[in-house]
From Swiss-Prot:
Pfam families: Lactamase_B (PF00753)
Keywords: Hydrolase, Metal-binding, Zinc
Chain positions recorded as Zn(2+) 1 binding sites: H80, H82, H169, D188
Induction and repression of expression: Expression is under strict control of the medium composition. Induced by citrate, probably via the two-component regulatory system CitT/CitS. Repressed by rapidly metabolized carbon sources like glucose, glycerol and inositol, via the carbon catabolite repression system. Is also repressed by succinate and glutamate, albeit to a lesser extent.
Protein name per the record: Probable metallo-hydrolase YflN
Needed co-factor(s): Zn(2+)
UniProt binding sites for Zn(2+) 2: D84, H85, D188, H241
Uppermost EC category: hydrolase
Source organism (scientific name): Bacillus subtilis (strain 168)
Stated family: Belongs to the metallo-beta-lactamase superfamily.
Segments forming a coiled coil: none
Lineage: Bacteria, Bacillati, Bacillota, Bacilli, Bacillales
EC numbers on record: 3.-.-.-
Length: 264
């Protein structure tokens, strides 16, 4: 059973947006999900992450608007298993019998075997950080649908994409990259809003930040993951929280952010 609705939101909640060629985004309260279109099947897509609890209807309605009533959901790729990225997955799977893929190190958190560590409300100042002990961190069990991503870095159904291990925020966090357009779907490895601060979350103030500190137990590894992403030289940065960034100006900022995090 999914968690109850959580009254955390932003001014962009419910807004769909074209994130990159063939990639459509949707802000679900405080988190983003992405619909990646299959090039050969214009009405088919892979869903990246599954939003906040009780958001299945919003996600499905956006899919209908973007891909038509006869849309085909091929699979769901999870960047990790935190509540704001898997919130609607159980309800979605009740209606669509599709495979779910996640890094092997995240499997315990989505097969009912292990809960995430407790939140760290004092890791960084801000009201959201203070509230973080109230956020769900328990495991869900979607054993009948979930499987580990291929070890070779390929992404099922998405031949142009590769997945990259970006641990730190969680042990098996991943990001996705497509060379065409140098598009990076970062998940929470790096985000574009200071997620710890309620006011910034509410207005979606665009700034480059590391993963939410209150749910990031390994800051040093998170910094190494950001350096890895900087090395990809992305030109479109699509994050789990915040407004996407495009161009090349943010590349050096990624390196500076990693260096700043590693010194904490």
């Amino acid at each position: 059973m999914s968690d109850p609705y959580m009254p955390l939101t932003s001014v962009r909640s419910g807004a769909g947006f074209e994130a990159a060629k063939g990639v459509h985004g949707l802000t679900v309260q405080i988190a983003n999900v992405y619909f990646i279109q299959l090039p050969s099947e214009p009405h088919s897509f892979v869903l990246i992450d599954a939003g906040m609890p009780q958001s299945a209807g919003v996600i499905v309605n956006e899919a209908k608007q973007r891909f038509g009533e006869g849309f085909q959901l091929k699979a769901i790729i999870l960047t990790h298993g935190h509540f704001d990225h898997i919130g609607a997955i159980e309800e979605i799977l009740e209606h669509w019998d599709v495979p779910v893929y996640i890094h092997s190190r995240e499997m315990p958190y989505v097969t009912g075997k292990e809960d995430y560590p407790p939140a760290r409300p004092d890791s960084k100042s801000g009201l959201v950080a203070k509230l973080s002990p109230l956020f769900p961190r328990h495991s869900i069990d979607i054993s009948s649908h979930v499987q580990a991503l291929p070890e070779d870095g390929s992404v099922p159904f998405l031949d142009e994409w590769m997945w990259i291990a970006t641990p730190g925020h969680t042990p098996g966090h991943i990001s996705l990259f497509r060379d065409d357009g140098r598009v990076l779907v970062a998940g929470d490895a790096v985000i574009t809003v200071e997620q710890e601060k309620m006011a910034d979350v509410l207005i979606q103030k665009q700034e480059l930040h590391g993963p939410p500190a209150y749910f990031t137990p390994d800051t040093e590894t998170a910094a190494e993951s950001i350096l890895k992403l900087a090395g990809l030289e992305p030109e479109a940065l699509l994050t789990g929280h915040g407004i996407p960034m495009t161009g090349k100006n943010f590349r050096s900022d990624l390196t500076e952010l990693a260096n700043r995090l590693s010194s904490i």
